[in-house]
């Protein structure tokens, strides 16, 4: 499914335990409509040892967030994204203030 967000966009989290935080989109799962935001929605994961010499360990990892719970964040404003054509090119812009992204 098409999304208006791209990898590398700064987003603000709207819901959940990290509400109000901002971060960069690391990856997008277009099939399940989830995004992974850098340093947000952290969970602990147990990694088992692969060999008898290694030890099992607990790592912190970013968990996916539903795409409806994030909004593009630019110049201190969180806004929805729109598209407009300028010089036969499709451009993204913030709907709140009309700024190009």
Swiss-Prot record:
GO terms for biological process: translation. GO terms for molecular function: rRNA binding; structural constituent of ribosome. Coiled coil: none annotated. It comes from the Bacteria. Keywords: Ribonucleoprotein, Ribosomal protein, RNA-binding, rRNA-binding. One of its GO terms (cellular component) is ribonucleoprotein complex. Belongs to the universal ribosomal protein uL24 family. Part of the 50S ribosomal subunit. One of two assembly initiator proteins, it binds directly to the 5'-end of the 23S rRNA, where it nucleates assembly of the 50S subunit. This is Large ribosomal subunit protein uL24. It comes from Borrelia turicatae (strain 91E135). The gene is rplX.
